[in-house]
Amino acid sequence: LLFTVCLHHFLGCDLDRVYEELGTRFPEIVFVRCFMDPIMQKHGLTPDQKLRKAMYDPLITKEPDPLTVTLVGSDFVLDESSDIKRLLRSTGHTLRELPACKTWAEYQQLGSAGVFVSCYPPAKYGADMLAERLNRTHLYLPGCFDYEEIKEEIRSLIKELQAGWSREDTSNTECADITSEEIEAFYQREVTLCEDSINHAKSIIGDTPVVLDYLYHPRPLGLAKLLLEHGFHVTTVYLDSISPEEKPAFDWLKLHHPDLELRATIQT
């Protein structure tokens, strides 16, 4: 992984020529073009978006496996209790993740997925480009705090898995047989468990003031809305911008909790 910095841009370095020469001299090494150019954050793609795309550029085209799903652009392996992991496990699918890869061969298997999924906003661009390059489907299922949005994401994932099953005529009856009633039952169970956990947390935290930072989650306003709806004493949210994905939460907070402070991170 080679990181170029602001100085390379100031000096007008011919980076294409540099990488070409490196590839010629060391053909056995794959050089990934990474970026550390904060001066360019305000225009176009951010360094984070470009890096998350670059991490998957070495993947080569493979025969798609309809029973494999690759999670793109995440920093950590999904927890075993995550919705996506449990759903895929129940339908006989294999989930592949970059942080779980230990060898180059395992890394290359990421490209064998029939479906790519991304959950982190800065990963969406790279996942779109990867899916287009390898001629696959990409589902953007962002982490969120609204039950109905989560429900629709679950439906979208299962619908795409069933479509892949149908196209390839596989024998994956577990996925094909999932009904709307079963999805609804799964959803209701998850909501109940979530509500129980939130209420348990509230019984411990009580009226202690809560301050949120956008570095914890890309949807801090959605989290603030969830907590306030459940009686938590959220006082401040630190963030430098408001994502379009957060507009419904922002509008709700403005109407129901106009006293909530939104502060720029420079004010910490």
Where are these regions (language model features)?
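An N-terminal assembly and electron-transfer interface module characteristic of large anaerobic redox
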Residues: 1-268
